[in-house]
Swiss-Prot record:
UniProt keyword Lipid metabolism, yes or no: no
Family that this chain belongs to: Belongs to the EF-1-beta/EF-1-delta family.
Superkingdom of source: Archaea
Any Pfam family hit: EF1_GNE
Reported function: Promotes the exchange of GDP for GTP in EF-1-alpha/GDP, thus allowing the regeneration of EF-1-alpha/GTP that could then be used to form the ternary complex EF-1-alpha/GTP/AAtRNA.
Species this chain originates from: Metallosphaera sedula (strain ATCC 51363 / DSM 5348 / JCM 9185 / NBRC 15509 / TH2)
Record flagged with keyword Protein biosynthesis: yes
Protein name (database record): Elongation factor 1-beta
HAMAP family noted in UniProt: EF1_beta
PANTHER family the record matches: ELONGATION FACTOR 1-BETA (PTHR39647:SF1)
Length: 91
């Protein structure tokens, strides 16, 4: 089965949200077959930053990327999360 790379932007509730803590909690909640490949921060506005994570996951996953968005959005300190990119990793 082929994997896909999902680029997920996680928006904090405020500038006091610890994005490193959010990333660690996300990693601990990832289902089997999912893997955090990369993480970075991206400025939004007025000193507020979003967490951008690159997650490898199975292509044929029930619910698609909705599960990943819901999982990230459920973390304390997270306002919401949205998929901003997806690409296939194999042929």
């Amino acid at each position: 089965m082929t994997d896909v790379m999902v680029v997920l932007k996680v928006f904090p509730e405020g500038d006091e949200t610890d994005l490193e803590k959010v990333a660690n909690e996300l990693v601990s909640k990832l289902p089997e077959g999912y893997k955090l490949v990369r993480k970075e921060t991206e400025p939004i506005a007025f000193g507020l930053k979003a967490l951008v994570v690159y997650v490898s996951m199975p292509e044929k996953t029930e619910g698609g990327t909705d599960t990943l968005e819901e999982l990230a959005s459920s973390i304390e300190g997270v306002s919401h999360a949205e998929v901003v990119g997806i690409t296939r990793l194999g042929f």
